[in-house]
Structure formats: structure tokens, C-alpha cells
Amino acid sequence: MLKKIPNILTIGRIIIVPFFVLAFYLPGFYGDLTALILFIIASFTDFLDGMLARMLGEESKLGELLDPIADKIIVATALILLVMDGTIKNYEVIAAIIILTREILISGLREFLAEGKIKLPVSNLAKLKTVLQMISIGLLLSGDTGNKIINFQDYNAQTIGIILLWLSAALTLFTAYDYMRKGIDHAMSEDNKD
């Protein structure tokens, strides 16, 4: 049973998404709180499932497939909802677009490389990017309540969330470049073999 826990956590993260969307649209404090808690649970299971899989020696093909999909679904859903409700607005939308575009590009690149039996390992910088994304989205989801709790002069939860969103977008560009360079190098080396 313990060996199945990482995959159960990953699948659970996907199952959380519709409930997260419903909670996001619940009015008031309890809606904000419920959406935030569900996002935190999803973010924590992202860390936990990989760690458990490595600890238990249960890294599986299913986990390799579903983990990045689950990550992208929760992040993309949260960013789209935050843009739709105006929390992320104006030029800040560019940061969300950068993040979403990178996720699509890198997913395609991973798929392309997988055909050649080449794995694209997650870099430490990409892990940092993910942590910053999760924290920024969590702060942005915290709404007015978060602003009351986190408020240092001109920096409240929303402002800090936007700053971290831009930082994660910058890391997103850097890691996308790194992954694309590796992918292009591989594609060119394959072309040279022909």
C-alpha cells in the first residue's frame, strides 16, 4: 500500500482542481480560505509525492507522466482564475502568460525528447521557480484576508504575490531557455546522424 501513495497523491492533486475552482467562486472569506487551503494541499502534495516516490523506491512511469500534468493543471487553473477575477491585471498578465507559455513549450519538448528515450531532468532552478510560483499564487489567493495579515508598509500579500510572480516569470524564462537549448542540441545531433 505504501508504494502506491505517491501516485495516489498525484491523482489526488488532479482531483482537487474542480473543487479548487468551485471554492474560488464561493463568495467571501470562506471561499477565499477554502480555495487557498486546497491550493496549499495541492502544492504540498507536489513536493510530497516526489519525495515519497524516491524514498520508497517507487518512481513509476505513471508518476512520471501524471506529476508534471498535475502541476501544470493546478498552476494554470489558478493563474487563469486570478486573471479572470482581476487579481492579476494589466501588465501583470504578461508574467502569467510567460509562465503558461513555458509550461506548454516544455511539455512539448519533454514529449519530443521522450520519443528518443531522452529524459530532461528537473533542474534546481526549475524547482525554485515552482516554489516561487506556488508561494506567489498562494499569496494572491489569500485575498483581502491575506492583505490584513501580511501588511508591511506598502507591501501587502497581493503586492508580495505579484513581485514573486514576476520573479518566477523571470526564472521561467531562464529555465525555458536552458531546457530549449538542451532540446535543440539533441535535435541537431540527431539530424547530424542522418
Regions flagged by a language model, labelled:
Residues L2-K3, I11-I15, E64-D67:
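Hydrophobic alpha-helical transmembrane segments of integral membrane proteins
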Residues T10, S60, S123:
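Residue-level signal for threonine
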Residues M1-N7, V17, P27, A35-S43, ...:
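C-terminal membrane-associated helical module and adjoining short loops/tails
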Residues I16-L65, A78-I98, N156-L173:
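Membrane-embedded alpha-helical segments that form the functional core of polytopic membrane enzymes
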